[in-house]
UniProtKB/Swiss-Prot annotation:
Physiological role: Catalyzes the conversion of 4-hydroxy-tetrahydrodipicolinate (HTPA) to tetrahydrodipicolinate.
Coiled coil ranges: none
Keywords from the UniProt entry: Amino-acid biosynthesis, Cytoplasm, Diaminopimelate biosynthesis, Lysine biosynthesis, NAD, NADP, Oxidoreductase
Gene from which the chain derives: dapB
Protein name in the entry: 4-hydroxy-tetrahydrodipicolinate reductase
Enzyme Commission number(s): 1.17.1.8
Reaction catalysis annotation: (S)-2,3,4,5-tetrahydrodipicolinate + NAD(+) + H2O = (2S,4S)-4-hydroxy-2,3,4,5-tetrahydrodipicolinate + NADH + H(+); (S)-2,3,4,5-tetrahydrodipicolinate + NADP(+) + H2O = (2S,4S)-4-hydroxy-2,3,4,5-tetrahydrodipicolinate + NADPH + H(+)
Binding site for NAD(+): G9, A10, Q11, G12, R13, V14, G77, T78, T79, A104, P105, N106, F107
Assigned GO CC terms: cytosol
Lineage: Bacteria, Bacillati, Actinomycetota, Actinomycetes, Mycobacteriales
Matches recorded under SUPFAM superfamilies: Glyceraldehyde-3-phosphate dehydrogenase-like, C-terminal domain, NAD(P)-binding Rossmann-fold domains
Organism: Corynebacterium diphtheriae (strain ATCC 700971 / NCTC 13129 / Biotype gravis)
Binding of (S)-2,3,4,5-tetrahydrodipicolinate, residues: H135, G144, T145
One biological process term in Gene Ontology: lysine biosynthetic process via diaminopimelate
Amino acid sequence: MAIKVGVLGAQGRVGQAIVAGVTAAYDLELVAEVDRGDSLDVLVQSGAEVIVDFTTPDSVMDNLEFCISHGIHCVVGTTGFTPERLEIVKKWAEEKGNTGVLIAPNFAISAVLTMAFARQAARFFDSAEVVECHHPNKLDAPSGTAIHTAEGIAQARREAGMPTQPDATEQSLDGARGADVGGVKVHAVRMTGMVAHEEVIFGGPGQSLTIRQDSYDRTSFVPGVLVGVRNVAQHLGLTVGLEHYLDI
Protein backbone atom coordinates (compact mmCIF):
# COMPACT_ATOMS: atom_id res chain seq x y z
CA MET A 1 0.00 0.00 0.00
CA ALA A 2 1.34 3.42 -0.94
CA ILE A 3 2.53 5.78 1.81
CA LYS A 4 0.36 8.91 1.93
CA VAL A 5 2.55 12.02 1.82
CA GLY A 6 1.94 15.72 2.40
CA VAL A 7 4.44 18.36 1.30
CA LEU A 8 4.79 21.61 3.27
CA GLY A 9 6.36 24.45 1.31
CA ALA A 10 5.00 22.83 -1.84
CA GLN A 11 5.28 25.98 -3.97
CA GLY A 12 8.92 26.64 -3.15
CA ARG A 13 11.69 25.54 -5.50
CA VAL A 14 12.65 22.53 -3.42
CA GLY A 15 9.02 21.84 -2.60
CA GLN A 16 8.11 21.64 -6.28
CA ALA A 17 10.90 19.13 -6.86
CA ILE A 18 9.68 17.05 -3.90
CA VAL A 19 6.10 17.13 -5.19
CA ALA A 20 7.29 15.86 -8.57
CA GLY A 21 9.43 13.17 -6.95
CA VAL A 22 6.64 11.90 -4.70
CA THR A 23 4.17 11.93 -7.59
CA ALA A 24 6.51 9.85 -9.74
CA ALA A 25 7.23 7.24 -7.04
CA TYR A 26 5.22 4.03 -7.43
CA ASP A 27 5.03 3.40 -3.67
CA LEU A 28 4.06 6.92 -2.55
CA GLU A 29 0.82 8.89 -2.87
CA LEU A 30 0.76 12.68 -2.74
CA VAL A 31 -2.33 13.60 -0.72
CA ALA A 32 -1.66 17.22 0.30
CA GLU A 33 0.27 20.26 -0.92
CA VAL A 34 0.51 22.94 1.76
CA ASP A 35 2.01 26.38 1.39
CA ARG A 36 1.98 29.72 3.19
CA GLY A 37 -1.51 30.64 4.39
CA ASP A 38 -2.93 27.12 4.03
CA SER A 39 -4.42 25.31 7.02
CA LEU A 40 -2.50 22.32 8.36
CA ASP A 41 -5.84 20.62 8.97
CA VAL A 42 -5.73 19.41 5.37
CA LEU A 43 -2.99 16.97 6.44
CA VAL A 44 -5.36 15.27 8.86
CA GLN A 45 -8.31 15.43 6.48
CA SER A 46 -6.29 13.84 3.66
CA GLY A 47 -4.92 11.08 5.87
CA ALA A 48 -1.27 12.03 5.42
CA GLU A 49 1.03 9.51 7.11
CA VAL A 50 4.28 11.38 6.44
CA ILE A 51 4.98 15.04 5.76
CA VAL A 52 8.00 16.59 4.08
CA ASP A 53 8.78 20.09 5.37
CA PHE A 54 10.81 22.54 3.30
CA THR A 55 9.37 25.78 4.68
CA THR A 56 11.10 28.46 6.77
CA PRO A 57 12.75 28.61 10.20
CA ASP A 58 9.88 30.85 11.34
CA SER A 59 7.16 28.30 10.63
CA VAL A 60 8.78 24.89 10.95
CA MET A 61 8.37 24.52 14.72
CA ASP A 62 4.62 25.17 14.56
CA ASN A 63 4.38 22.70 11.69
CA LEU A 64 6.22 20.01 13.63
CA GLU A 65 4.22 20.54 16.80
CA PHE A 66 0.99 20.09 14.83
CA CYS A 67 2.15 17.03 12.91
CA ILE A 68 3.70 15.24 15.87
CA SER A 69 0.60 15.86 17.99
CA HIS A 70 -1.47 14.21 15.24
CA GLY A 71 0.88 11.24 14.86
CA ILE A 72 2.15 12.24 11.42
CA HIS A 73 5.77 11.28 10.74
CA CYS A 74 8.02 14.16 9.68
CA VAL A 75 10.90 14.45 7.20
CA VAL A 76 12.41 17.91 7.55
CA GLY A 77 14.85 19.77 5.32
CA THR A 78 14.09 23.24 6.69
CA THR A 79 17.11 24.97 8.23
CA GLY A 80 17.58 26.97 11.41
CA PHE A 81 17.59 24.20 14.02
CA THR A 82 19.53 25.18 17.14
CA PRO A 83 20.36 22.65 19.88
CA GLU A 84 17.49 24.15 21.88
CA ARG A 85 15.03 23.63 19.04
CA LEU A 86 16.19 20.06 18.52
CA GLU A 87 15.68 19.34 22.20
CA ILE A 88 12.10 20.65 22.00
CA VAL A 89 11.33 18.47 18.97
CA LYS A 90 12.92 15.46 20.67
CA LYS A 91 10.68 16.01 23.70
CA TRP A 92 7.54 16.29 21.55
CA ALA A 93 8.38 13.05 19.72
CA GLU A 94 9.21 11.17 22.92
CA GLU A 95 6.00 12.29 24.59
CA LYS A 96 3.93 11.22 21.58
CA GLY A 97 5.78 7.92 21.39
CA ASN A 98 4.54 6.71 18.00
CA THR A 99 6.01 9.31 15.66
CA GLY A 100 9.30 9.45 13.79
CA VAL A 101 11.02 12.74 12.96
CA LEU A 102 14.01 13.00 10.61
CA ILE A 103 15.76 16.37 10.49
CA ALA A 104 18.66 16.52 8.05
CA PRO A 105 20.98 19.43 7.26
CA ASN A 106 21.17 18.13 3.70
CA PHE A 107 19.25 15.48 1.77
CA ALA A 108 21.64 15.29 -1.19
CA ILE A 109 23.28 11.89 -0.82
CA SER A 110 26.53 13.35 -2.18
CA ALA A 111 26.49 15.87 0.68
CA VAL A 112 25.80 13.17 3.26
CA LEU A 113 28.76 11.18 1.94
CA THR A 114 30.94 14.33 2.01
CA MET A 115 30.19 14.76 5.71
CA ALA A 116 30.99 11.10 6.37
CA PHE A 117 34.25 11.22 4.40
CA ALA A 118 35.26 14.41 6.23
CA ARG A 119 34.83 12.74 9.61
CA GLN A 120 36.98 9.84 8.44
CA ALA A 121 39.75 12.10 7.15
CA ALA A 122 39.84 14.53 10.07
CA ARG A 123 42.27 12.64 12.32
CA PHE A 124 44.92 12.40 9.61
CA PHE A 125 45.48 16.14 9.03
CA ASP A 126 46.71 19.04 11.17
CA SER A 127 44.34 21.57 9.60
CA ALA A 128 40.76 21.52 8.36
CA GLU A 129 38.42 24.25 7.11
CA VAL A 130 35.01 24.26 5.42
CA VAL A 131 33.85 26.54 2.59
CA GLU A 132 30.19 26.53 1.55
CA CYS A 133 28.64 28.37 -1.40
CA HIS A 134 24.93 29.03 -1.91
CA HIS A 135 22.53 31.19 -3.88
CA PRO A 136 22.05 34.73 -2.46
CA ASN A 137 18.46 34.05 -1.35
CA LYS A 138 19.51 31.60 1.36
CA LEU A 139 18.45 32.96 4.75
CA ASP A 140 21.07 31.43 7.06
CA ALA A 141 24.86 31.48 7.06
CA PRO A 142 26.79 29.33 7.41
CA SER A 143 24.58 26.55 6.14
CA GLY A 144 23.37 23.74 8.36
CA THR A 145 25.37 21.34 6.21
CA ALA A 146 28.60 23.27 6.78
CA ILE A 147 27.97 23.46 10.53
CA HIS A 148 27.20 19.73 10.67
CA THR A 149 30.35 18.99 8.66
CA ALA A 150 32.51 21.11 10.96
CA GLU A 151 30.97 19.57 14.07
CA GLY A 152 31.78 16.10 12.75
CA ILE A 153 35.38 17.09 12.02
CA ALA A 154 35.75 18.68 15.46
CA GLN A 155 34.37 15.58 17.18
CA ALA A 156 36.70 13.29 15.24
CA ARG A 157 39.67 15.46 16.19
CA ARG A 158 38.69 15.41 19.87
CA GLU A 159 38.25 11.64 19.85
CA ALA A 160 41.71 11.30 18.30
CA GLY A 161 43.22 13.55 21.00
CA MET A 162 44.43 16.10 18.48
CA PRO A 163 45.60 19.57 19.55
CA THR A 164 44.14 22.91 18.47
CA GLN A 165 44.68 23.64 14.79
CA PRO A 166 47.78 25.73 14.01
CA ASP A 167 46.94 29.37 13.24
CA ALA A 168 49.30 32.26 13.99
CA THR A 169 46.82 34.98 12.92
CA GLU A 170 47.01 37.96 15.28
CA GLN A 171 45.37 40.68 13.20
CA SER A 172 42.55 40.41 10.66
CA LEU A 173 39.47 42.18 9.41
CA ASP A 174 36.29 41.13 11.19
CA GLY A 175 35.13 37.81 9.80
CA ALA A 176 38.20 37.26 7.65
CA ARG A 177 38.93 33.91 9.27
CA GLY A 178 35.33 32.74 9.13
CA ALA A 179 33.04 31.42 11.84
CA ASP A 180 34.42 29.08 14.49
CA VAL A 181 32.57 25.79 14.92
CA GLY A 182 34.29 23.69 17.55
CA GLY A 183 37.70 24.96 16.47
CA VAL A 184 37.01 24.42 12.76
CA LYS A 185 36.72 27.54 10.58
CA VAL A 186 33.67 27.76 8.32
CA HIS A 187 33.39 30.25 5.44
CA ALA A 188 30.11 31.14 3.70
CA VAL A 189 29.82 32.47 0.14
CA ARG A 190 26.54 33.86 -1.23
CA MET A 191 26.61 34.30 -5.00
CA THR A 192 24.27 34.51 -7.96
CA GLY A 193 24.44 31.36 -10.07
CA MET A 194 25.19 29.05 -7.15
CA VAL A 195 22.79 26.43 -5.79
CA ALA A 196 24.49 24.45 -2.99
CA HIS A 197 28.18 23.57 -2.86
CA GLU A 198 30.69 22.59 -0.19
CA GLU A 199 34.45 22.14 0.00
CA VAL A 200 36.23 20.57 2.94
CA ILE A 201 39.95 21.33 2.83
CA PHE A 202 42.46 19.37 4.90
CA GLY A 203 46.15 20.18 5.23
CA GLY A 204 49.19 18.33 6.53
CA PRO A 205 52.96 18.48 6.00
CA GLY A 206 53.57 18.71 2.25
CA GLN A 207 50.04 17.69 1.26
CA SER A 208 46.38 18.63 1.21
CA LEU A 209 43.07 16.91 0.56
CA THR A 210 39.94 18.58 -0.80
CA ILE A 211 36.53 16.93 -0.67
CA ARG A 212 33.98 18.77 -2.81
CA GLN A 213 30.25 18.33 -3.28
CA ASP A 214 28.00 20.15 -5.76
CA SER A 215 24.23 20.28 -6.04
CA TYR A 216 23.46 21.85 -9.41
CA ASP A 217 19.69 21.58 -9.08
CA ARG A 218 17.09 21.11 -6.34
CA THR A 219 16.31 17.67 -7.74
CA SER A 220 19.54 16.54 -6.04
CA PHE A 221 17.63 16.46 -2.75
CA VAL A 222 14.79 14.23 -3.96
CA PRO A 223 16.38 10.74 -3.70
CA GLY A 224 17.44 11.40 -0.11
CA VAL A 225 14.04 12.80 0.84
CA LEU A 226 12.35 9.70 -0.56
CA VAL A 227 14.67 7.51 1.51
CA GLY A 228 13.48 9.47 4.54
CA VAL A 229 9.80 9.19 3.63
CA ARG A 230 10.05 5.43 3.15
CA ASN A 231 11.92 4.78 6.40
CA VAL A 232 10.87 7.40 8.97
CA ALA A 233 8.06 5.26 10.42
CA GLN A 234 10.67 2.66 11.44
CA HIS A 235 12.72 5.24 13.38
CA LEU A 236 10.52 6.57 16.18
CA GLY A 237 11.64 9.69 18.03
CA LEU A 238 14.08 12.26 16.66
CA THR A 239 16.87 11.39 14.24
CA VAL A 240 19.27 14.10 13.06
CA GLY A 241 21.08 13.33 9.81
CA LEU A 242 20.16 11.17 6.82
CA GLU A 243 23.33 9.13 7.34
CA HIS A 244 21.54 7.16 10.07
CA TYR A 245 19.12 5.85 7.43
CA LEU A 246 21.91 5.00 4.97
CA ASP A 247 24.04 2.83 7.28
CA ILE A 248 27.21 4.89 6.84
